[in-house]
From Swiss-Prot:
GO-annotated molecular function: fumarate transmembrane transporter activity; malate:proton symporter activity; succinate transmembrane transporter activity
Protein name per UniProt: C4-dicarboxylate transport protein
An example Gene Ontology CC term for this record: plasma membrane
Keyword field contains Oxidoreductase: no
SUPFAM superfamilies registered for this protein in UniProt: Proton glutamate symport protein (SSF118215)
Gene for this chain: dctA
Annotated coiled-coil segments of the chain: none
Localization per Swiss-Prot or TrEMBL: Cell inner membrane
Length: 428
């Protein structure tokens, strides 16, 4: 029997977002007080992200017969991330050149007050490439889980899973125990997900109440350019990759619509990470590939953040009438390819990454970030949405490359018939 429409999660989330926008617009002071609802939901999700990643990766690797496969999957994923990330960076640059959202502002850089962005600049300067790599190694195993550091947890899980795979049957008891814990954790996620409408309402009410719809008007062209470019990236770039792999990007987006609406309401792609991993497994991707690609992608495959970075830098240059040579723009691309790897799926990380990029391109004043500080919160939704779609597509693609994609289950899931028997599915 089909659920009444008002009991469907994505309908509830849409309604919550609309109510949040209305409350923020009509009663801003009250709406700002709703912030704990959004923060609380994200904290509940983040509470289980670390353990889920650990358990999923460990059981996936422990079940692999060939340990060389772990390195092969990781290598293919990183190669895919670099290629697609470069496309995203170039597309952001090209779209800003064509649509020129910053032209006409004629702002004197000397009049900009950089104090408002000083904290972001300080965070950006605080970590070099070596620091980033060293940060992947945790001080202790417990510390990695306590701090919720995804890459550190991933490293521990890789080592743990590798040892279990080497032990074989001697490690079967531990593997089965961790597999049971995984089921419990996903059960917790199902319970927490029911609170998604509350979280989306609180986060959206706070955003509109604090920043106001009026703050969007002067920079609507930049916002429109960014959203349009992100849509083009998903439909054209990711769409072409999806078609080549054998599935429809439109149907895939429809398949993860609940996760996308949670991200839209919270502006954090991490808020939907556990649900996305579960959905990808149900769509025919092997657990081992999902466990390796999705967590890694949250640091190395942020397509929306990549588009935003090159677009924001060029917008500031246009708004302050600074001409960038082609060599400077190529330098910008190279720098952005490195700095973007330090971004995570948490709200606000994109702005810190932008500060890191500008710090290495001194031609453009760091104080220019103040021009987009007020609208960054509204652009973060689009960044997070593009990021999660990009990571989902990446997982399906790498699964196909590894011949670990159950195409029958994939097509059944994307067509809305998720009850296809896994045993009838053909491995490709």
């Amino acid at each position: 029997m089909k659920k009444p429409f008002y009991k469907v999660l994505y309908v509830q989330v849409i309604f919550a977002i609309v109510v949040g926008v209305l409350l923020g617009h009509l009663y801003p002071s009250l709406a700002v007080d709703m912030k704990p609802l959004g923060d609380g939901f994200i904290k509940l999700i983040k509470m289980v992200i670390g353990p889920i990643i650990f358990c999923t990766v460990v059981t996936g690797i422990a079940g692999m017969q060939d340990m060389k496969k772990v390195g092969r999957v990781g290598g293919k994923a990183l190669l895919y991330f670099e290629i697609v990330s470069t496309f995203a960076l170039v597309l952001g640059l090209a779209a800003t050149h064509i649509l020129r959202p910053g032209v006409g502002f004629n702002i004197d850089p000397a009049t900009l007050n950089g104090k408002e962005v000083a904290s972001y600049a300080a965070k950006a300067h605080g970590q070099s490439t070596v620091d980033f790599l060293m940060h992947i190694i945790p001080n202790t195993m417990i510390d990695a889980f306590a701090q919720g550091e995804i890459l550190q947890i991933l490293l521990i899980a890789l080592l743990f899973g590798s040892v279990l795979a080497h032990l074989g049957e001697r490690g079967r008891v531990v593997t089965d125990f961790i597999d049971g814990i995984t089921r419990v954790l996903f059960g917790i996620v199902h319970i927490v997900t029911k609170l998604a409408p509350v979280g989306a309402f609180g986060a959206m009410a706070f955003t509109i109440g604090k920043y106001g719809v009026g703050s969007l008007v002067p920079l609507l062209k930049l916002i429109g350019t960014f959203y349009l470019t992100s849509v083009v990236f998903v439909l054209v770039v990711l769409g072409a990759i999806a078609r080549f792999t054998g599935f429809s990007i439109v149907r895939f987006v429809g398949y993860i619509k609940e996760e996308l609406l949670i991200v839209l309401g919270t502006s954090s792609s991490e808020a939907a990470l556990p649900q996305l991993m579960e959905k990808l497994e149900k769509a025919g991707c092997s657990r081992s590939v999902v466990g390796l690609v999705v967590p890694t992608g949250y640091s190395f495959n942020l397509d929306g953040t990549n588009i935003y970075m090159t677009m924001a830098v060029l917008f500031i240059a246009q708004a302050t009438n600074i001409e960038l040579t082609w060599m400077q723009q190529l330098t910008l691309l190279a720098v952005a390819m490195l700095t973007s790897k330090g971004a995570s799926g948490v709200t606000g990380a994109g702005f810190i990454t932008l500060a890191a990029t500008l710090a290495v391109v001194p031609t453009i004043p760091l104080s220019g970030m103040v021009l987009i500080l007020g609208i960054d919160r509204f652009m973060s939704e689009c960044r997070a949405l593009t990021n999660i779609v990009g990571n989902g597509v990446a997982t399906v693609v790498v699964s196909a490359w590894e011949k670990e994609l159950d195409r029958a289950k994939l097509h059944a899931a994307l067509s809305g018939n998720g009850k296809a028997a896994a045993g009838e599915a053909a491995r490709v």
